[in-house]
Amino acid sequence: MTEYLLSAGICMAIVSILLIGMAISNVSKGQYAKRFFFFATSCLVLTLVVVSSLSSSANASQTDNGVNRSGSEDPTVYSATSTKKLHKEPATLIKAIDGDTVKLMYKGQPMTFRLLLVDTPETKHPKKGVEKYGPEASAFTKKMVENANKIEVEFDKGQRTDKYGRGLAYIYADGKMVNEALVRQGLAKVAYVYKPNNTHEQLLRKSEAQAKKEKLNIWSEDNADSGQ
């Protein structure tokens, strides 16, 4: 719409200039010619003002929402915040080590993975030894990954490995997140939460709250004083 008005304004300016030319050629013929000259000049000035205003409006509309007509972003107007989406990657099981640790073949290389945001009772700790519900957690994870036809890993937005070189990820067995399944069964706590590696934190906390409500395994009454 602005482009059409701009074109009309330019046409008006041309007509006004022609009228002024006619008025100048007849200015000596009398009072009416002088009035005609004044009218034509006024039309030209008004037209130039309108054209200038429309031109500014057209330029502004080209950067509406921070995007030029060409489709490129104008960084002075709009700055988009990039959001990295999580995606799953295929892997192959080598073995389950304990409740929250598995060894996988990932991108052609063997790699040990530590499940993000969860902590299961120990079974192989040099000082803690075997903790209550540790064997159950290990058996649960082992069953999930060994019975799965498809294993996938999903890294979060932050660092991908810990200080021991283990991958930090959500592990999926046939589409089911092992991390969440452990928490839901009361075999793991939500732990080691560090931003930005906490995309699924609320999902896990919701599952943990339900496990507590149902007093499952580490949240059971007979385990209340065990320090779990």
Curated annotation (Swiss-Prot):
EC numbers, comma separated: 3.1.31.1
Annotated protein name in UniProt: Thermonuclease
Cellular compartment(s): Secreted
Species this chain originates from: Staphylococcus aureus (strain N315)
Cofactor: Ca(2+)
SUPFAM superfamilies, sorted: Staphylococcal nuclease
Catalysed reaction equations from the record: Endonucleolytic cleavage to nucleoside 3'-phosphates and 3'-phosphooligonucleotide end-products
Free-text comment on the cofactor: Binds 1 Ca(2+) ion per subunit.
Molecular function (Gene Ontology), one example: endonuclease activity, active with either ribo- or deoxyribonucleic acids and producing 3'-phosphomonoesters
EC top class, as a word: hydrolase
Encoding gene, per UniProt annotation: nuc
Top-rank taxon: Bacteria
Leader sequence segment: 1-23
Family according to the record: Belongs to the thermonuclease family.
GO cellular component entries: extracellular region
Polar residues bias spans: 58-70
Residues at the catalytic site: 114, 122, 166
Function, in words: Enzyme that catalyzes the hydrolysis of both DNA and RNA at the 5' position of the phosphodiester bond.
Taxonomic lineage of the native organism: Bacteria, Bacillati, Bacillota, Bacilli, Bacillales
Keywords from the named record: Calcium, Endonuclease, Hydrolase, Metal-binding, Nuclease, Secreted, Signal, Zymogen
Binding site for Ca(2+): 100, 119-120
Region (Disordered): 58-83
Pfam family, any one: SNase
Record flagged with keyword Glycoprotein: no
Propeptide: 24-60
